[in-house]
UniProtKB/Swiss-Prot annotation:
Name of the gene: dnaK
Transmembrane segments annotated in the record for this chain: none
Family from the record: Belongs to the heat shock protein 70 family.
MF GO annotations: ATP binding; ATP-dependent protein folding chaperone; unfolded protein binding
Protein name: Chaperone protein DnaK
Organism annotation: Allorhizobium ampelinum (strain ATCC BAA-846 / DSM 112012 / S4) (Agrobacterium vitis (strain S4))
């Protein structure tokens, strides 16, 4: 039975895990790392880089290196948070055809779901390389505070990547699964998850295989990226004070600042002071300028104090919604890379009145929880019951633009709820059902998820028709809404798709693009491997011709030189073809066999002339040949 994998699709880093017996195992990627940067880059020659290779070239290619796109997923272009993000990233954020926020690289627009799909593809390939089999199904995590549009977009990303997403699971819930799988005694825990781009807090009751989420809260635009940018702004302001040059207008300098800020932030979690040193950051008429600055932990904490404090209100709201106090919490589990920051741990300790639990790896625990949930769905993990909640209230717009709730936040899912409404005018023959999600009293202040019309109502006085509106939320937190006229039996329903969102046709097109890209990546790799082998053979053959060319006939030597020239030409063409290179490599190997034979005979003759024991010289020849091949292989893999 094919394995179902668990993927933590993070803002900054992603991670993939699979059940190995009774334990969740985090899988290392092709670079040997357990987490993969959530970055995608497009080079000038059309190559697509994902993960660490994309991160390595970000400084030299800032406008085409896309990162933190999870913060844009499922968001409209006009969203104030998108507006804020535009000034902080070096790549263009554009308005998609459907009105959503998209990103642009090498002049082409991509939806955040498409970019996320490229990262998911990398995770899928990582798992396939480890398992030695195709992977087609996955459980993917999302921030608990993601709304319906963001969840749907994440599911779309999985589909584009060629994965059937069996379940969308909340990140804090996944972390609780990994933390509490072996715990038998009942506990009330809080999962404090401060990641690269989002913050979640969930209160759960766990024990004997039952994981019941009591409440969740958070901020989908608060995370490590904000801490980095706060430091970038400080460094740029200090540099401007000293040198009078605005670094934020220089995209290359901005990317270098961002990398330095992230590095300094990490170092300050374990040391009291760090030095930021960026030589040749910019230049003016007087010559090159360098940025050198010492930064203390206290200064950094002062810069980001308001960001850390922004996590407090959601924590208090979650405790209140769960009907517990901080004293009732038995354990606070820290999740997400930012939870390593001493200031964050200090605030958590003050808030909950106890030392937070640091026994889980904050970068890996979410993926492990996703793998456990995958195991539950597959039937490999027994006696685990997961009861999650919807993070935001759901309802419809009623007379006067009021938001009428049908399902309150923190309701256990899956769930279904109906309510009867009527018309506002006499002889009204159609009603528009506008579905929103949020906590504000007026519908316009909440997130509009979608709308649909129920038509063909018989003419009646206002207030007479009975229209039953039903909300149905599945285990992924994705909403379906139906409206039925009880008089005529007419019914209309929609599976809520973000008011922008991707249509099925969009997704199918992106699936085909993703498949074509995967094929192109495969071909590119085949070309690189063929070129490595060819260059290695050319090098060793040219060396042999130089040393022993006089041992073969002029015709044989010319055939070898022609084969070398043909192979070089095949490698150096603007669009190299792997099969062509392989065929010409084979030709060169065949024509150079006579040279090898001549070398062998020549060395045997020399051995005979010296009168030494031929067996001894044979060993030497074999060794020499072996060394040559080994040397070639070394060059091939370099």
């Amino acid at each position: 039975m094919a394995k179902v994998i668990g993927i933590d699709l993070g803002t900054t880093n992603s991670c993939v895990s699979v059940m190995d017996g009774k334990d969740a195992k985090v899988i290392e990627n092709s670079e040997g790392a357990r987490t993969t940067p959530s970055m995608v880059a497009f080079s000038d020659d059309g190559e697509r880089l994902v993960g660490q290779p994309a991160k390595r070239q970000a400084v030299t290619n800032p406008t085409n290196t896309l990162f933190a796109v999870k913060r844009l997923i499922g968001r409209r272009y006009e969203d104030p948070t998108v507006e804020k993000d535009k000034g902080l990233v070096p790549f263009p954020i554009i308005k998609g055809d459907n009105g959503d926020a998209w990103v642009e690289a090498q002049g082409k627009g991509y939806s955040p779901a498409q970019i996320s799909a490229m990262i998911l593809q990398k995770m899928k390939e990582t798992a396939e390389a480890y398992l030695g089999e195709k992977v087609e199904k996955a459980v993917i995590t999302v921030p608990a505070y993601f709304n319906d549009a963001q969840r749907q977009a994440t599911k779309d990303a999985g589909r584009i990547a060629g994965l059937e997403v069996l379940r969308i699971i909340n990140e804090p819930t996944a972390a609780a699964l990994a933390y509490g799988l072996d715990k038998t005694e009942g506990k009330t825990i809080a999962v404090y998850d401060l990641g690269g781009g989002t913050f979640d807090i969930s209160v759960l009751e766990i024990g004997d295989g039952v994981f019941e989420v009591k409440s969740t809260n958070g901020d989908t635009f608060l995370g490590g990226e904000d801490f980095d940018m706060r430091l970038v702004e400080y460094l740029a302001a200090e540099f401007k004070k000293e040198q009078g040059i605005e670094l934020k207008n220089d995209k290359l300098a901005l990317q270098r600042l961002k990398e330095a800020a992230e590095k300094a932030k990490i170092e300050l979690s374990s040391s009291q002071q760090t030095e930021i040193n960026l030589p040749f950051i910019t230049a003016d008429a007087s010559g090159p300028k360098h940025l050198t600055m010492k930064l203390t932990r206290a200064k950094f904490e002062n810069l980001v104090d308001d960001l850390v404090q922004r996590t407090v209100a959601p924590c208090k709201a979650a405790l209140k919604d769960a009907g517990v106090t901080a004293a009732d919490i038995d354990e606070v589990v820290l999740v997400g890379g930012m939870s390593r920051m001493p200031k964050v741990q200090e605030v958590v300790k003050q808030l909950f009145g106890k030392e937070p639990h640091k026994g889980v790896n904050p970068d890996e625990v979410v993926a492990m929880g996703a793998a456990i949930q995958a195991g539950v769905l597959q039937g490999d993990v027994k006696d685990v019951l997961l009861l999650d909640v919807t993070p935001l209230s759901l309802g419809i717009e009623t007379l006067g633009g009021v938001f009428t709730r049908l399902i309150d936040r923190n309701t256990t899912i899956p769930t279904k709820k109906s309510q009867v409404f009527s018309t506002a005018d006499d002889n009204q023959q159609a009603v528009t059902i506008r579905v929103s999600q949020g906590e504000r009293e007026m519908a316009q202040d909440n997130k509009l998820l979608g709308q649909f019309d129920l038509v063909g109502l018989p003419p009646s006085p206002r207030g007479v028709p009975q229209i039953e509106v039903t909300f149905d939320i599945d285990a992924n937190g994705i909403v379906q809404v139906s409206a039925k006229d009880k008089g005529t039996g007419k019914e209309q329903q929609i599976r809520i798709q973000a008011s922008g969102g991707l249509s099925d046709a969009d997704i199918e097109k992106m699936v085909k693009d993703a498949e074509a890209n995967a094929e192109a990546d495969k071909n590119r790799r085949a070309v690189v491997e063929a070129k490595n082998q060819a260059e290695s053979l050319i090098h060793s053959t040219e060396k042999s011709v130089k040393d022993y060319g006089d041992k073969v006939s002029a015709d044989d030597r010319k055939a070898i030189e022609d084969a070398i020239a043909a192979l070089k030409s095949s490698i150096e063409t603007s669009e190299p073809n792997a099969e062509d290179i392989q065929a010409k490599t084979q030709t060169l190997m065949e024509v150079s066999m006579k040279l090898g034979q001549a070398i062998y005979e020549s060395q045997q003759a020399e051995g005979g002339a010296e009168g030494g024991p031929s067996g001894h010289h044979d060993d030497g020849i074999v060794d020499a040949d072996y060394e040559e091949v080994k040397d070639d292989n070394t060059k091939k893999s370099a």
